[in-house]
Curated annotation (Swiss-Prot):
Top-level enzyme category: ligase
Encoding gene per record: tmcAL
Enzyme Commission number(s) of this protein: 6.3.4.-
GO biological process per UniProt: tRNA modification
Name of the featured protein: tRNA(Met) cytidine acetate ligase
Entry binding sites for ATP: 7-20, 102, 155, 180
Record-linked InterPro entries: Rossmann-like_a/b/a_fold, tRNA(Met)_cyd_acetate_ligase
Length: 395
């Protein structure tokens, strides 16, 4: 059985994602497609606009056969840890022959060369990278300059990290890349059929529903419309974040994963001086401390997740394959996975976790906390993680 693996967030699923899947299927023609998808919180350190179950259904509507969750602890870290956690799940499933990822360059050879140079990390490369960081460039800009590339966009960076992860994990999965279509990843305005997820979320936040409709498949549009009252935006965390940092001491801030020397004083002072989230972020944001990096720091502070805890989990990796949804082809694939995988499968956590290791239960504990907080933002029950079964999609 040959599986095609895709690592995604689908926040929300849009026409660019459909193009990626369609193009990948034309190149590979696999027996099934498995997506490793972020849960209720995404790599930008933000809540997903709509919950993971609905987003899994969006994916199943458009060519994905099996959706597995990337646990919260990896889904909300930097590109390197995000990629390592997700690639580990593809590898440990035992059934994935190919991974397809989107990239701005569409040039696999170039990305492989960049990954090789980054992995080798010669003294010259390390020093060059740090020199650019010290000059105030953010990581993606500094990495591009250190690799003598004109520019590396968000999906290029992730692609490099996927390739590095396959090497570090001794994975025999082959990679392909599909060039990203339409507007840049961070562009916040709708611009045609292939608009970015950022632009789609911004239009949703502004209530411009008519602008969204032509940027997503019809079934995605229906799910977004039907669940409009459950949309979640980062702004909803405003009071939680300001309160947290006003009562948090500097020593605690220093233990956060994204922290660097001196930031604790700026955070503490900004929290006292700011009355809105935008004001707070504007006092902290620099070229090096991007909004995304600050978002992750703020989320980890809210969840009381420090660098020692993340280092503990990063050392071992995701401990299970948690199924969010599947169709009939996905169910057949899951039977093969149960025979070949090096990790246990979770379909009903309340039952399955009883026989699993303390490490598995520890990891799932953070999933429960993260989803309970997410559901609080939309005034829903906080016990969902233990009791909700996977979506079974009709073919």
């Amino acid at each position: 059985m040959q599986g095609l693996g895709i690592i995604a967030e689908y926040n929300p699923f849009h026409n660019g994602h459909l193009y990626h899947i369609t193009n990948s299927l034309e190149q590979i023609r696999p027996d099934f497609v498995m997506a490793v998808m972020s849960g209720n919180w995404v790599q930008r350190g933000e809540p997903a606009i709509i919950d993971k179950w609905t987003r899994a259904e969006m994916a199943l509507n458009q060519g994905v056969d099996l959706v597995v969750e990337l646990p919260f602890l990896w889904a909300t870290q930097s590109a390197r840890e995000f990629a390592q956690g997700a690639v580990a799940l593809l590898k440990d499933s035992g059934v994935i022959s190919y991974q397809s990822f989107g990239s701005e360059t569409g040039d696999l050879t170039l990305l492989q060369r960049a990954a090789k140079l980054s992995l080798e990390e010669s003294e010259h490369f390390r020093q060059t990278l740090h020199n650019y960081l010290d000059q105030g460039f953010n990581f993606s800009e500094a990495l591009a300059k250190a690799l003598n590339l004109n520019e590396l966009a968000s999906n290029d960076i992730l692609g490099i990290e996927y390739l590095k992860s396959h090497d570090l994990l001794s994975s025999d999965i082959s990679c392909i890349t599909v060039q990203r279509q339409g507007s840049p990843y961070h562009k916040s305005e709708i611009s045609g059929k292939f608009s970015s997820a950022t632009a789609i979320r911004q239009a949703a936040k502004n209530g411009d529903l008519s602008l969204i409709k032509h940027t997503v498949p019809d079934q995605t549009w229906n799910l977004l419309s039907q669940n409009k009252t459950d949309w979640i935006f980062f702004k909803m965390l405003e009071q939680h974040i300001l309160y947290k940092f006003r009562i948090t001491n500097k020593e605690t801030i220093e233990q956060l994963m994204e922290w660097e020397q001196g930031l604790e004083n700026r955070i503490y002072n900004a929290s006292l001086d700011s009355c809105t989230l935008e004001e707070f972020i504007s006092k902290l944001k620099t070229k090096r401390y991007t909004r995304t990096r600050l978002n992750r720091l703020m989320l980890h502070a809210l969840m009381e997740i420090d660098k020692s805890l993340l280092n503990h989990f990063n050392t071992t990796g995701p401990p299970y394959l948690r199924v969010l949804g599947m169709n009939q082809r996905g169910r057949q694939a899951l039977k093969t996975i149960s025979d070949r995988a090096s990790l246990p499968i979770l379909t009903r956590p309340a039952r399955d976790l009883r026989s699993l290791s303390h490490y598995c239960r520890q990891c799932f504990h953070w999933e429960v906390k993260a989803s309970a907080f997410y559901n609080l933002l939309k005034q829903k029950d906080g016990r969902e993680e233990y009791i909700r079964p996977p979506i079974v999609h009709p073919d």
